[in-house]
Amino acid sequence: MTINFIKKKIFIINNQNKIIIFLLIFVIILLLSLKLSPGKDWDVFYSASKLLLEGKSPYNYETFGNPPWSLIISIPLVIVFPKKIAGDIWFVIGIFFFAITAYRLHAKPIAMGLFLIAPPTVHCLLNGNINWLPLFGFTLPPYIGLLFILIKPQIGIGLAIYWIINAYKSGGFIKVIKIILPTLIAYILSFVLYGFWIKNMFNIYKVSKLWNTSLWPYSVPLGLLLIIFGIKKKDPTWVYGAGPFLSPYVLFHVWDAVLVSLLRKTWILFFIVILLWIIVFYKL
């Protein structure tokens, strides 16, 4: 017991600066959240969750266009807490998932801190969006992760292609089916229960097309190149950022996926985060 206690103390002492930096970032972003109302995207998830709890289709809320399992975390919050408090907790959960994703992808503490204060991350958190859930899917086995990363296809489509091609190369169609079957069943059941809810995505596009930052179709070759590089090098890190380049609809916070691909390249991440903040302040 004494030896284990001493080891824990040594670990804390050796990592105290890293721990302090992380806690400071967490507290600053949290305080900023508490000063603001929950973001408009939280309104969407809150309203869709309430409809589901009332036995109605969450897609009656016309700007909810994610699969029904994207509400797995918001539903308990809606049951227990008022909207504002639930929104604040949602914000904290977002920070946790962003941080745990960076940790599971072997980011150094400085890289994790840069990722948490990057403009796309802050934008996602303040708007109450859910990018942290599909990004967390990057760290899961493909047969589970596919369910998560396709919550936002503009984030996960590149990695989905990579997983499927890798599965085919290593185990043929049988392995591909094993990977895609849980997600395929989930989508089929959702269509049976709620109809072709994907049409709501077009409503989202109409509402937010003014904020579309997609570089499509000019960015498609780059997205495909990242997938090819990842397959050749057998390294999914290359593919993490491919999704936004392949999608015709990309809001600013979706570019977080590109930052995830740079979590193990601290200096590059540092300069990109600084550049993004310069652009943000210039545009204000």
Regions found by a protein language model. Name each.
Residues T2-T139, Y143, I164-T266, F270, ...:
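Primarily membrane-embedded glycan-assembly and transfer machineries that use lipid-linked glycans
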